[in-house]
Curated annotation (Swiss-Prot):
Record carries keyword Cytoplasm: yes
Region (tRNA (mnm(5)s(2)U34)-methyltransferase): 1-235
A Pfam family this chain is assigned to: Methyltransf_30
Protein's recorded name: tRNA 5-methylaminomethyl-2-thiouridine biosynthesis bifunctional protein MnmC
Classification of source organism: Bacteria, Pseudomonadati, Pseudomonadota, Gammaproteobacteria, Pseudomonadales
Known role: Catalyzes the last two steps in the biosynthesis of 5-methylaminomethyl-2-thiouridine (mnm(5)s(2)U) at the wobble position (U34) in tRNA. Catalyzes the FAD-dependent demodification of cmnm(5)s(2)U34 to nm(5)s(2)U34, followed by the transfer of a methyl group from S-adenosyl-L-methionine to nm(5)s(2)U34, to form mnm(5)s(2)U34.
Alphabetized PANTHER family for the sequence: SARCOSINE DEHYDROGENASE-RELATED, TRNA 5-METHYLAMINOMETHYL-2-THIOURIDINE BIOSYNTHESIS BIFUNCTIONAL PROTEIN MNMC
Gene (name only): mnmC
Amino acid sequence: MSDAHNAQLDWDEHGQPLSRSYGDVYFSRANGLEETRHVFLAHNQIIERCQALPAGGRLVIGETGFGTGLNFLCAWQAFAEHAPRDARLHFVSVEKFPLTQTDLQRALALWPELAPYAEQLLAQYRAIHPGFQRLLLDGGRVVLTLMIGDVLECLPQLDARIDAWFLDGFAPAKNPEMWTDSLFTELARLSAPGATLATFTSAGFVRRGLIAAGFAVQRVKGFGHKREMLAGPFQAEPAPRSAPWFARPTLAAGARQAVVIGAGLAGCATAASLAARGWRVTLLERHDDVAREASGNPQGVLYLKLSAHGTVLSRLIVAGFGHTRRLLERLQRGSDWDACGVLQLAFDAKEAERQNKLAAAFPDDLLHALPQTEAEARAGIGLPAGGLFYPDAGWVHPPALCRQLAQHPLIELRPYQEALSLSRQQERWCVEGQNGVLAEAPVLILACAAEIGRLLPEANLPLKRIRGQISRLPANESSSALRTVVCAEGYVAPARDDEHTLGASFDFHSDDLTPSVAEHAGNLELLREISQDLAERLDTQTLDPATLQGRAAFRCTSPDYLPLVGPLAAGQAFNQAYAVLAKDARQVPETPCPWLDGLYINSGHGSRGLITAPLSGELIAAWLEDEPLPLPREVAEACHPNRFMLRQLIRGTGSPT
């Protein structure tokens, strides 16, 4: 695919952008800033609603047509100036053709008044690929969820309650595919009680469609030369949400304290997302510091193993990659991470065919094919083939990311605290260790990989451990030519601290974490398959595997290779409540889900933890805070811990897989 998923723009004599595809302007030529304030802010009472927010309150705005981000920045400015300091703004917007960062910067330069907000947006506006993309701004106080794609495909996948709608986008005459009854029905489904809507158009079919969907809109004075526009409240009953087994548990009022077990990527990310929302978090770690197990490798690779068919896993990976990539901007490039790119070699005919399909399915700025000569020039070493290049990817020092995530005044890291048992007493979870209670709180998040099975055996979660070993190879002047991560069956990364990381093995049977000479030898063989040239530069022909340093750890994965992220039901009560599904899987009983109150899971990330674990922290926080989910509803449900009990019930099997 080319870069055609980005907006194709022309610029007029005043430096204002016009859409080449729709033949329409992005905002009023007279004064786009004042148009936004009149149409969307004033007629949704945004300033008044910000002023009325309670301490710790939240305003959720939904928008069709992100465009130049002008509406978002105006709403953010109003929120910053009028809302309580501990309030939060969630802004959810759909955009089929996002602007490039260069075009966005040029467009926003028209509004110097918004520069403090535009600068933050531009700093985070990277890896904006198809699907859901979450951007954290103003220290996490402002959350922007961009849905990149067609509005009628994105909105049905949104799980949110919207307080105010900015119904924007190109004019109905220019973009009739958007302005349909299907759109108005989705706006109604997503509206919170008391929601409002405003739009620049006063077209009769739009007004009639909105009224039919439950919006009591009226024609009011428009902006500038536009005589009329539409605005009004949502007055219908809110639509029911998910099936009960995927519904959001009710959280007891004031329960904004949590214990997180496990200070790897999943645990640190969960703690960070909760702390950003004002939660006090106790982070329990059985070792001396964060990232001492699977998250402790010197270099991990941001590698996107995708499908050309838009699978749930692919959508999770693209969304997670964007989120992690934006988080990495907080770290020190060169020592903590590097966006050096990742090259996946087309090492055989089957892989080459798979890569051709991927190159046709995804935009060039996410991945594109390189022939062998270009791949060698990009990598700086000789290669056996060309492959797919991911220009925004690279390597990460996972402990640095974990430390950054855990550094928050509301997070208390407690090392040398090994959890041995759990109990629920007086609406609080108690975590007990060898010498008594380690911590207690109304909410408990288990982010301790396969150890969840030991702490919660009755849940029968099908988590499994897979041993992996990396090898550390001393770099030399010749090997410093390597400029990108290169992958085949294994991977090798450019040097960090004068060492290349090489890996990684997969062992489904061993429980021994002592690095083995045999697996060092296996990793060296993986290196030779990646690049005989680099292997020779590193003198592997004379290198004794027994002299290599390395480390081994357990990956934690699930049977469907998706993580487990979200709340968990009590197994026996779940089976009783939904026994009818064993006879008819189409039934959706109204019985509320028998949740294990206050218990959440963030585990099973396998070898993709760098990509999926940080965004999963946001997903946990969204479940707890009843916020817009950062992932498509279908993806969030596919990652739900209850899915295994549900499958077991429907299939009538004894296995939860």
